Amino acid sequence: MATKLIGGEIYDPAHQIDGKKQDLYIVDGKITHKLPDNEKITATHDLSGCIVMAGAIDLHTHIGGGKVNIARTMMLEDEHAHPHPSTQICRSGNGHVVPSTFSTGYRYAEMGYTACFEPAVLPVNARQAHMEMADTPMVDKGGYVLLGNDDFLLSMMQKKVSQSAINDYVAWILDASQCIGIKVVNAGGVHAFKYNQRRLDVDESGPAGITPRDIINKLSRAVHELGVSHPLHVHASNLGIPGNFKSTLATMAAAEGLPIHLTHIQFHSYGTEGDYKFSSAACEIAEAINCTPNVTADVGQIMFGQTITTSGDTMMQYFGHEHAHPKKWTVMDIECEMGCGVIPFKYRDKSFVNALQWAIGLEIFLQVN
């Protein structure tokens, strides 16, 4: 049983197809350009005048879990100012900075996305995160579960348990949370913040006597040995701090050649040059990515205007709360598993720092192969 798609204008960079009109077939849920001999066409759709291309994937977007609802509660004025009435085919919703679930799905579909992944699922809150994502229409969803600051893993590492034991724990967490990957946020730093520590670099021991390098190494190895499709998803140390590109390079090295994905790397690509002691280190980061085949990254490009930042990195969220706009914020500990910080923020194109952040993201886009 197959479905035929006729007359569409196909764009497929992976196969060097640029605007070619060609028929396609859907067989057993997969798209193919040839119909198998034993298949019969059961439906035909005319796509004349339409563009046919692969759906976009957002591998890091906050669309489910407690922090998103905290953000909605914090920005009620935004919810009220942006109502989205129902139509014949769409349900009602609201919000611009933090849209409701229905509006989130519709906006993603309008932009051509077909899959979105929530990168900060707390094990204790996984059920609620999945329920919220299930309420988001029109796109496939998945999540990465947070480890690397939880007391259980750190206690295992203190006791110097075997790698296989850590692998078992990671596998159990993945199964219990029903997530498709592992995320580490400021490895060991969120745990250190609970002890009133304000910074933790990659080779600095935290209160548990464990370094971020140790945590990243153990978790990246566990994810690799378990055969998880997505590599360890890493929010590196010292987000937003001038000079943090050195921490980012050290984080890449911590994986020791195993696959690792560095997220919103723009926020981890800062130097200390110039009058303001804040500069771009995009060249150094891009060169390192190009020369390190086990490392992938997403940019985390900023957009000017009002937004709200949601993160498990309580250390860095507390550091930035003085810049909240409007002036309200929250950080909290979650069951000794992880942290949560929610801060509204307005990126301004006339701000030196914000304009440079935008330019750094563009540099990375252009320089990474």
Predicted regions and their residues:
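N-terminal metal-binding scaffold of metallo-dependent hydrolase/deaminase domains
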Residues: 1-53
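Divalent metal-coordination and catalytic microenvironments
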Residues: 8, 24, 29, 49, ...
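Metal-associated gating/positioning segment near the N- to mid-region
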Residues: 50-132
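Hydrophobic faces of well-ordered beta-strands that scaffold small-molecule active sites
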Residues: 55-59, 116-118, 141-145, 180-184, ...
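Active-site mouth loops of central-metabolism enzymes
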Residues: 82-100, 147-167, 207-209
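Short, surface-exposed connector motifs at secondary-structure boundaries
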Residues: 108-115, 225-233, 259-260, 367-369
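Alpha-helix-loop-beta-strand connector modules within alpha/beta enzyme cores
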Residues: 133-144, 216-227
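Active-site neighborhoods of metal-dependent hydrolases
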Residues: 165-222, 238-249, 255-369
